[in-house]
Amino acid sequence: MQVRMLTAAGYGFISALLLSCSIHAKKLQKAGSPQGTDCTQIWKLTPQASSGVYVIQPAGVKTHFKVYCEMRLDGGWTVFQKRSGGNVSFNRKWEAYKNGFGNQTRDHWLGLKKVFLLTKNKSMKWTMRVDLWDHEGGTAYAEYKNFRLKNEKAAFKLHVGKYTGNAGDAIRGAYPGINQDGYSFSTVDRDNDGCSPCIFGDIAETECALSQGGGWWYSKCGSASLNGEWHPTGEHIGWSSGLHWLTWKPPAPYSAKASQMMIKSV
């Protein structure tokens, strides 16, 4: 009898603990003040927290802002790009890419300034993950260690370290000479792509952001460009502008059905 009573009490304690964690996680999402320095910290403090919009204040930063936290997978990812349809245009100018646009629960771009504020603390290391969905039901991913952006004066120059995944290292390119690591961000009104012009067969390219239809860290255009025009199933192959990760679906330009880019502190 005594053993049964202890077991029942144990179950009661565990149930109460789980309920408390669940309530705390919901309160976190509804709170208006900062709930952590980034999504990774929130997840570590509350492993039961669900995916959704949270308020964060990066270490050493005076301002706080909303982000979408992906708490599935291994938890604690801060989403900075999401594409799943054509309702939100990504063909925008510098200020829009700097400050962000879209709905954080749907398709959006968090903003280069916010990503810089997250990653500028050199005492922390960050991993970037790119998730891709094709039009045939398949998925792929690419992860990069030591992700970081420089400030606006350096045009939010990209740095990535070691690659792992099954989508291919499109950031460094499908062939030599188009490595986007170390390149600044380009938009239709601010060109940093290194083309003057770039020659592709019989085509002379002067502005990659213009032909690709969205802002990106272009290096003579390159093999990665996930902010171009979205294309529906059946019309997703052969376009110069698209959701391109050319090491994943060669040789013709294949535009992904959906993409998500996110970072995590490690």
Segments from the language model and where they lie:
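Mature extracellular or lumenal effector domains of secreted proteins
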Residues: 2-266
